Design a protein with these regions (language model features):
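Short N-terminal "domain-start" leader segments
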Residues: 1-21, 31, 40-41
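A short, charged, amphipathic alpha-helix used as a generic interaction element across diverse proteins
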Residues: 24-50
Length: 50
């Protein structure tokens, strides 16, 4: 497995919200996105997903 996308519920001063983390095991990177499709697009750009 080269990557995974995890959905987490976070809390801040604006309240509760969902965030999606792209965990890139191949390149040892972690990125946070507000919507899942942006995380998927980034995985495609990095060559992790076809």
């Amino acid at each position: 497995m080269e990557y995974e996308i995890k959905k987490v519920t976070m809390f801040s001063n604006i309240g509760l919200y969902d965030a999606y983390f792209l965990i890139d095991y191949k390149n040892c990177q972690l990125n946070k996105f507000g919507v899942e499709h942006l995380a998927q697009e980034e995985a495609i750009k990095r060559g992790l997903k076809e």
